[in-house]
């Protein structure tokens, strides 16, 4: 049985990347929350 998580950079960035987050109001909310918390990485 193969494992379910087979990571690929491009699809990951397309769905969870910074540019993608900035497109929606809620995405911007996510980034701002992570910024307020002091996360080193704001998006994937």
Swiss-Prot record:
GO biological process: translation
Top-rank lineage group of the source organism: Bacteria
Bias (Basic residues) ranges: 1-16, 24-44
Cystine pairings recorded for this chain: none
Keyword Hydrolase appears in the UniProt entry: no
InterPro entries the UniProt entry points to: Ribosomal_bL34, Ribosomal_bL34_CS
NCBIfam families with a match to the protein in the record: rpmH_bact (TIGR01030)
Protein name in the entry: Large ribosomal subunit protein bL34
Lineage: Bacteria, Pseudomonadati, Campylobacterota, Epsilonproteobacteria, Campylobacterales
């Amino acid at each position: 049985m193969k494992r379910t998580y087979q990571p690929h950079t491009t699809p990951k960035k397309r769905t969870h990347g910074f540019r993608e987050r900035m497109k929606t109001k809620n995405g911007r909310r996510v980034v701002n929350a992570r910024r307020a918390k002091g996360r080193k990485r704001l998006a994937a």
